[in-house]
């Protein structure tokens, strides 16, 4: 399988404009990444392809076609989650193609799993939830025992619509008001 390199973005020297950052044209960057993945898939020996979220799905799909190896995708969120239902059709198409091509799909929550199954029409047997998690530190119990006089309410998450920081602010205000 040959990659059509004529559709990728290059600079005036003919080099791929691949930055690894979010450029002005994100879809072009995804295509450039796909081209790099095709070269790697032709030259490396590997057992499995892991595509981590929609930006890497086209590269993973192409690597799968070249290598015949299974592909697992990891879904932290879908465009339904990120946009709260105002889905970008280009992003949806890439997400759907990645999910359709995947041999297995890992989601980080049951909510995301249900979205993948219902909105992207995936077989439930193909989708597994593996929650984000950390091991609690030994000293956490000691922190709970300390006598704090000040009130501490913490939000741990990106400040994006899907993380719901506005809900945190509402709940924090209620908690603070009820503990006076």
Q: Which stretches of residues belong to each language-model region?
A:
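Active-site proximal beta-strand in glycosyltransferases
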Residues: 48-50, 57, 61-82, 106
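A short helix->loop->beta-strand "cap" motif at the edges of active sites that frequently abuts
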Residues: 67-70, 102, 124-126
């Amino acid at each position: 399988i040959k990659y059509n390199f004529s559709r990728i973005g290059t600079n005036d020297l003919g080099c791929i404009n691949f930055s690894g950052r979010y450029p002005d044209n994100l879809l072009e960057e995804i295509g450039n990444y796909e081209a790099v993945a095709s070269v790697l898939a032709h030259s490396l020996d590997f057992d499995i392809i892991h595509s981590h979220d929609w930006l890497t799905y086209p590269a993973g799909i192409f690597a799968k076609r070249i290598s015949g190896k299974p592909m697992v995708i990891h879904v932290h969120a879908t465009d339904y989650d990120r946009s709260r239902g105002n889905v970008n059709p280009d992003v949806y198409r890439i997400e759907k193609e990645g999910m359709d091509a995947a041999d297995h799909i890992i989601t980080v929550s049951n909510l995301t799993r249900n979205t993948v199954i219902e909105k992207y029409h995936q077989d439930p047997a193909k989708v597994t939830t593996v929650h984000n998690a950390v091991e609690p530190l030994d000293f956490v119990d000691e922190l709970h025992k300390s006598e704090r006089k000040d009130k501490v309410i913490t939000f741990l998450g990106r400040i994006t619509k899907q993380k719901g920081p506005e809900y945190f602010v509402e709940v924090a205000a209620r908690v603070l008001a009820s503990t006076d």
